[in-house]
């Protein structure tokens, strides 16, 4: 880069695989949010939070060197108001702190708009958002900061929506466009800031719930596998959630106090979901219905919230460790796994009650053709066994091929490549069969040569090459005679 009359050092960047890849997921870096914890200036706290942010990135990217890019679920900065010039300056200082870490010069980052980002154009001045909404129906209600966007990486569609915009019809229009343009994406991941299924004290029972009734059916209808949230500065993961299929059109912001009948009615009205899975300590689901929702704690520790007093029925795991955390999402052809780590130790976070935070969704590869091929191969092998024409060793070798293919068919996490390879291997089953050569069995059912004749031929072969020489000489003589006849015919034609 050329800046202030000088060239910077060269920055190395290498692209990562798009077949199987890893993504880092963080919540609320919120540079500058530690302000108010002591008497230092805003600039001091922005510097302090930026230092911790760099520490998290350094720790995570050193431990997980295969990270393709970073996803940040909103609130990159803390300064919300921009009514004064000093407010605008403070925002710029905080954005400078957010973008300061050297790791961000070689690792892409995709952000979403948090409530602290939403009231200033400074957000969109700092981030390039691919496929950003421009149509009127895709931008209705957009905030000053920008609007929704999406991108494709490998087999996964990533969609980011600005939930500071409560016009969910706008979000549905963008989601519809993204899905229609990426129909072959194996995985769909949605990211937004407000946690509609979180467990933090400050938001999960207020503004997050307002959006819940409207977004849940959209998310369910477009078959998103995972939703990444921020906002509440706690960790949580839900069970698999789907919509209840009912209309929830009457919704308002939560009452100001929880000690009222109105609030209890509000809570009941916001039960707009079904739990598709609620098994305790279930860390892997195979071909599940519904969507899993994650809530990320602060990646910098600039601010934390308490967990809500009573754990909601949709929450499978939650934690407030009061330490910066980050998550890594590993995506393959058939699995999507999310693991959450302590940023200081890189050890996997353990949620309340000793619940592990690792969670895997398995989408099995299509094995229809493989299963049919196994059945056909086994049928042919069984017939070969009954015929008694083939050696035990070759039958065992063919059976081993079928058994190996069956192992792939039984493995929920077998990849599409594994399945194709197993199916191809079955094509060799018949070629593995070797006929018994004991002078008593036909080498070929369609061969009319009698066994006695075969013995004679075998005898010639054993005695030496005399017959072979005789056949060769006879062949030469025949070829010579043919040549003479052809030559004579040509002369007559002339």
Give the positions of each predicted feature:
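Extended active-site neighborhood of metal-dependent phosphoesterases/phosphodiesterases
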Residues: 1-12, 84-184, 188, 214, ...
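N-terminal active-site segment of His-dependent metallophosphoesterases
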Residues: 2-83
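Active-site-proximal beta-strand elements of phosphoester/diester hydrolases
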Residues: 21-42, 155-165, 189-193, 292-298, ...
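Active-site neighborhood of phospho(di)ester-bond hydrolases with catalytic His/Asp-centered motifs
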Residues: 25-27, 69-75, 109-115, 162, ...
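Short acidic, glycine-rich surface-loop motifs adjacent to enzyme active sites
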Residues: 67, 72-80, 182-202
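Cytoplasmic C-terminal tails of single-pass
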Residues: 491-494
